[in-house]
């Protein structure tokens, strides 16, 4: 199999920054993982230099086998009951005004880890009541009860990524369901209309423009408020290959289309990831809350 050469627009220049070391030290201090590190995010240095990070809770081993993802697969460890407190302390130490919490998928747990998410939200609110909280959740096998546990803890944004277009699910997300992911987003709005919902799509996996636009329409029909669109980068030769490096102009086309169908916030670009510059939604959240 031949591999595509990365275009210039995907090349990143890394600058030394003391703030990056500070973030790494704080994460070590509280024994926390970040999806930035586990998923080899290309924006890790930019985000760490701004003292932002996406916390990865419930361990670093996933029970699913998505072919695009670099997070470890296998048998997960027992939940750490102190983790919600440690996350809250790290948020305080970093002085975050906006925090994103995500997790591996824990199909081994009765509620998929929903109660652990809820406890993390409550712990942060107790320590940093003015910090906005975004949670990027797994599908919880489509459990309304599990989604309710998270929503009832009152995060500001509940995100769940569809990741790719429907046709590619069997080869990219074999243990997931496109319809179920859309249903999760619908559930959030059914439980609490005031909570913002968000999703993310990767491109370059072999989809067409029309399929991406159809996925965006499906998200809007599920009342999704925010969306991110980014280039898929294969972690290794053992993962799903990159079929295409999508030109920045196409990302702009997707952004314009997403805005035209009603998304309140759109991030679309080659290096965009689901939590990239998530703090930019803070003003939108605060302005809508005032209405």
From Swiss-Prot:
Its recorded reaction(s) are: [[Fe-S] cluster scaffold protein carrying a second [4Fe-4S](2+) cluster] + N(6)-octanoyl-L-lysyl-[protein] + 2 oxidized [2Fe-2S]-[ferredoxin] + 2 S-adenosyl-L-methionine + 4 H(+) = [[Fe-S] cluster scaffold protein] + N(6)-[(R)-dihydrolipoyl]-L-lysyl-[protein] + 4 Fe(3+) + 2 hydrogen sulfide + 2 5'-deoxyadenosine + 2 L-methionine + 2 reduced [2Fe-2S]-[ferredoxin]
Q: Name one GO molecular function term.
A: lipoate synthase activity
Record's cofactor remark: Binds 2 [4Fe-4S] clusters per subunit. One cluster is coordinated with 3 cysteines and an exchangeable S-adenosyl-L-methionine.
Q: PROSITE patterns this protein is in?
A: RADICAL_SAM
Domain (Radical SAM core): give its ranges: 48-264
Name its co-factor(s).
Answer: [4Fe-4S] cluster
- InterPro entries documented for this protein: Aldolase_TIM, Elp3/MiaA/NifB-like_rSAM, Lipoyl_synth, rSAM
- The residues the record assigns to binding [4Fe-4S] cluster 2 are 62, 66, 69
Which pathway does the protein contribute to?
Protein modification; protein lipoylation via endogenous pathway; protein N(6)-(lipoyl)lysine from octanoyl-[acyl-carrier-protein]: step 2/2
| A single Gene Ontology CC term | cytoplasm
The protein's Enzyme Commission number: 2.8.1.8
Q: Which domain of life is it from?
A: Bacteria
Which UniProt keywords are present, listed alphabetically?
Answer: 4Fe-4S, Cytoplasm, Iron, Iron-sulfur, Metal-binding, S-adenosyl-L-methionine, Transferase
Residues annotated as binding [4Fe-4S] cluster 1 are 36, 41, 47, 275
Where does this polypeptide localize? Cytoplasm
Which CDD domains did the record assign?
Answer: Radical_SAM
The UniProt entry, under PANTHER family, shows: LIPOYL SYNTHASE, LIPOYL SYNTHASE, MITOCHONDRIAL
- Can you tell me which family this protein belongs to? Belongs to the radical SAM superfamily. Lipoyl synthase family.
Question: This chain belongs to which protein, by name?
Answer: Lipoyl synthase
Organism encoding this protein: Caldicellulosiruptor bescii (strain ATCC BAA-1888 / DSM 6725 / KCTC 15123 / Z-1320) (Anaerocellum thermophilum)
């Amino acid at each position: 199999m031949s591999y595509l050469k990365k275009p210039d627009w995907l090349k990143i220049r890394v600058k030394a920054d003391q703030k990056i070391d500070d973030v790494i030290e704080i994460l070590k201090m509280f024994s926390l993982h970040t999806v930035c590190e586990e998923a080899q995010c290309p924006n890790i240095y930019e985000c760490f230099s701004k003292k932002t990070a996406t916390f990865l809770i419930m361990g670093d081993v996933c029970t699913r086998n998505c072919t695009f993802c670099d997070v470890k697969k296998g048998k997960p460890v027992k939940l750490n009951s102190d983790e919600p407190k440690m996350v809250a302390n790290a948020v305080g130490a970093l002085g975050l005004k906006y925090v994103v919490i995500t997790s591996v998928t824990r199909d081994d747990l009765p509620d998929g880890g929903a109660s652990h998410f809820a406890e993390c939200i409550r712990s942060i609110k107790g320590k940093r009541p003015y910090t906005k909280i975004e949670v990027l959740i797994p599908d919880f096998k489509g459990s309304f009860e599990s989604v309710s546990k998270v929503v009832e803890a009152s995060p500001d944004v509940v995100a769940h990524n569809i990741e790719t277009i429907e046709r590619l699910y069997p080869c990219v997300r074999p243990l997931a369901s496109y319809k179920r992911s859309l249903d999760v987003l619908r559930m959030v709005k059914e439980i609490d209309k005031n909570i913002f919902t968000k999703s993310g799509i990767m491109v370059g996996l072999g989809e067409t423009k029309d399929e991406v636009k159809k996925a965006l329409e499906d998200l809007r029909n599920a009342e999704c408020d925010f969306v991110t669109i980014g280039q898929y980068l294969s972690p290794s030769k053992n993962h799903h290959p990159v079929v295409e490096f999508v030109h920045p102009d196409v990302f702009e086309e997707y952004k314009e289309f997403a805005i035209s169908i009603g998304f309140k916030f759109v991030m679309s670009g080659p290096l965009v990831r689901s939590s990239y510059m998530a703090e930019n939604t803070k003003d939108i959240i605060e302005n809508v809350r005032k209405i």
